[in-house]
């Protein structure tokens, strides 16, 4: 029985008579059955990788699974023949609220590639019921509300497996739910998500407020609960320990069921620690092994040979460090092991910068990972060099053999085959259909660089995608885009280092320029998508400024035909899948040396956008691949920025005082026009922040940014030359396939 026959059998009625909800439920169950029929990926070497991460931003799964199972076209045609539109069926599916930003999206891409490459490897995380939060805009400000996603019809499968997890004053019993991870034309792996039996969504009050002390009911409610107070920090520790204790118990259970000796755990298991949230897996595994009769020395050796750590940040504040008294309050049974690990380091090394426990009695999670793991990797070439030579230099001096680079990647199944089908049709027409299995085949598109017909068709594909975005946003939110404008897009977490505030200053510059009578040749539409962490005040202030500008421009008849600002509400994977194919100018403007890699830059590039960015993260490698003519680079280099920090010689106020243009743009934030729309206190806060602090050097780069952006828009008018830039970017994007990244992880670290 083929997939279509199974679908109709599961549905139990004629497709034409079924509702979209009924068809979605039948498709989901048929996909689950087909994934099981594909069978698990099994390692020939008897080794398995477990990828532990606090977040997995997996996006909607229906279409991705249909593509990976090789039945998408079959299902689409079957539905169409019965008067149904697969796109409408897709809209029934809720997006899982299991991630936030690039960290979680990378984890999702990696699981897709691990399965596609036929490697035996599963993800381990938590089953958050309400996600990060659902973002709504009220009074030009972000408001957080719960984001429930779990329905009776769900990709989650109750495994019947659970473990007891001990805390200081009580223990919790877990429930394990699995989500199938289908490989493209390959076997199936699993994403294991642990939950508590006693979770209670009803304890959430106004917005996303809840009793942070009620661990028995709140533990798996929210991803990254507000940690601006002690209760929030303790809840984070409860969450992290619950995740790693379940993960460690599950891993040992699988090993014992396979008949492996736990004395040889490292021969059969590799645990990839994705950022510092899962770091307690190291002492927890040691605890579980010693409880089974293995000596402390041997347990430490086994765990060190089993665990590998991926560093995702250059920001010191993101490298977690927990006060000892907090850990004693939550997991006192781990502290003797952590103290033992710290004592062994202290006995060998005098340098205070490598100690696991610092002079303020805080436990540094990343330091524990580096001492008691066998691999430390960065996620872009520049990032890894900064780790080795600056941020983590004391560790590189001790363990040079542990450090390696694994430049991030994205899955082309979702970020091309699923979300940009018109571009895929164009690619197939011009002979690179093999990219589905070998992304390097995209280079074959360079043969069309002087083919005017192909270039015009490529421009037409982009225009169709812009029109599709216009129709989608108008239907979803009532916002009407001008699809004849240039689409300039910045979508990513709202953080000062990503410098959405610099984009704001460009908008102000352009607004004032238009008011002075200088109309652009072509209208410009600036699109933002971003959530700010609930306790991150400055980030929320920046959103307020963007929304005020959106309102100001919309209601100014002199400016509205030429300049538009749109901030999409509740930016998520589904929205990204609409925005990325329509983007023409990709904003990657973080302060050089601060973005570890970025993957949005790769998605935009793959879909034919041209990058406007700093020499930061993976932008450096994009620049190397496409050449100077096909990317727009501005701003000071990472070396220059690092030197500014070392010398403390950047003073934002000097730029504000000495440059009348910068002063004019910054002061516009508190102009009568803005104060009429916005909250006075909020606008004053962000105005003062830019002048008095500006930790991420917005005013240092803003003039170069504006000049470079104006050059981008001027070059856009030569449509054939622009189309050639698009082709080069698409053709060179093959390097950024997560299949390549995972192949390198397996070659150098996992050996599955």
What annotation goes with each model-predicted range?
Residues 1-752:
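A conserved ligand/cofactor-binding region detector
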């Amino acid at each position: 029985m083929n997939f279509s026959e199974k679908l109709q059998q599961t549905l139990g009625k004629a497709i034409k008579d079924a509702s979209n909800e009924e068809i979605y439920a039948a498709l989901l169950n048929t996909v689950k059955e087909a994934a099981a029929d594909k069978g698990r990926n099994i390692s020939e070497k008897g080794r398995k990788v477990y990828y532990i991460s606090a977040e997995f931003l997996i996006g909607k799964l229906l279409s991705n699974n249909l593509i990976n199972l090789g039945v998408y076209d079959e299902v689409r045609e079957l539905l169409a023949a019965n008067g149904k539109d697969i796109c409408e069926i897709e809209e029934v599916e809720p997006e899982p609220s299991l991630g936030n930003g690039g960290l979680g999206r990378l984890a999702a891409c990696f699981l897709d590639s691990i399965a596609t490459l036929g490697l035996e490897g599963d993800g381990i995380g938590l089953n958050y019921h309400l996600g990060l939060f659902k973002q709504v805009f009220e009074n030009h400000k972000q408001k957080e509300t719960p984001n429930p996603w779990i329905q009776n019809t769900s990709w989650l499968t109750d495994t019947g497996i659970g473990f007891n997890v001990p805390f200081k004053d009580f223990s919790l019993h877990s429930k394990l739910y699995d989500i199938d991870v289908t490989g493209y034309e390959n076997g199936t792996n699993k994403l294991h998500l642990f939950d508590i039996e006693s979770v209670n969504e009803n304890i959430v009050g106004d917005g996303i407020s809840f009793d942070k002390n009620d661990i028995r009911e709140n533990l798996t409610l929210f991803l990254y609960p507000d940690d601006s107070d002690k209760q929030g920090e303790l809840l984070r520790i409860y969450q992290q320990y619950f995740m790693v204790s379940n993960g460690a118990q599950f891993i040992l259970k699988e090993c014992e069921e396979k008949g492996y000796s736990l004395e040889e755990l490292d021969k059969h298991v590799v645990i990839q620690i994705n950022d510092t949230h899962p770091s307690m897996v190291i002492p927890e595994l040691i605890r579980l092994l010693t409880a089974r009769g293995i000596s402390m020395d041997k347990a430490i050796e086994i765990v060190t040979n089993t665990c590998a750590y991926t560093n995702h940040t250059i920001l010191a504040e993101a490298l977690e460090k927990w006060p000892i008294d907090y850990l004693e309050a939550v997991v006192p049974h781990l502290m003797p092991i952590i103290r033992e690990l710290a004592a062994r380091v202290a006995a060998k090394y005098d340098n205070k910068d490598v100690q696991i426990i610092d002079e303020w009695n805080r436990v540094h999670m990343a330091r524990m990972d580096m001492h008691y793991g066998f691999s430390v990797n960065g996620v872009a070439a520049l990032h890894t060099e900064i780790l080795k030579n600056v941020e983590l230099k004391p560790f590189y001096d001790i363990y040079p053999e542990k450090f390696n680079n694994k430049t991030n990647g994205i899955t082309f199944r979702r970020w091309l085959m699923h979300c940009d089908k018109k571009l895929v049709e164009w690619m197939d027409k011009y002979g690179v259909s093999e990219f589905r299995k070998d992304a390097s085949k995209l280079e074959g598109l360079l043969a069309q660089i002087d083919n005017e017909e192909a270039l015009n068709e490529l421009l037409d594909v982009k225009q169709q995608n812009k029109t599709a975005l216009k129709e989608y946003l108008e239907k979803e939110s009532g916002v009407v885009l001008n699809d004849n404008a240039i689409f300039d897009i910045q979508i990513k977490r709202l953080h000062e280092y990503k410098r959405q505030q610099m984009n704001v200053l460009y908008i102000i510059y352009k607004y004032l320029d238009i008011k002075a009578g200088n109309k652009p040749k072509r209208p410009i539409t600036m699109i933002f998508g971003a959530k700010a962490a609930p306790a991150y005040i400055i980030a929320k202030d920046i959103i307020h400024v963007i929304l005020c500008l959106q309102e100001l421009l919309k209601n100014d008849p002199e400016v509205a035909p030429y300049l538009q600002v749109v901030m999409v509400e509740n930016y998520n994977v589904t929205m990204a899948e609409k925005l990325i194919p329509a983007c023409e100018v990709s904003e990657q403007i973080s302060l050089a040396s601060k973005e570890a890699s970025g993957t949005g830059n790769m998605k935009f590039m793959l879909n034919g956008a041209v990058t406007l960015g700093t020499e930061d993260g993976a932008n450096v490698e994009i620049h190397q691949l496409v050449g100077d003519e096909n990317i727009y680079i501005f701003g000071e280099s990472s070396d220059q920025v690092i030197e500014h920090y070392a010398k403390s010689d950047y003073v934002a106020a000097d730029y504000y005082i000495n440059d009348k243009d910068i002063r004019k743009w910054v002061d516009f934030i508190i102009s009568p026009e803005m104060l009429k729309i916005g909250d006075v206190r909020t606008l004053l806060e962000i105005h003062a922040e830019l002048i008095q602090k500006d930790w991420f050097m917005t005013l240092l780069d803003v003039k170069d940014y504006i000049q470079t952006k104006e050059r981008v828009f001027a070059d856009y008018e030569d449509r054939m030359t622009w189309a050639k830039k698009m082709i080069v970017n698409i053709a060179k994007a093959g390097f950024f396939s997560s299949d390549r990244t995972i192949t390198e992880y397996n070659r150098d670290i996992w050996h599955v």
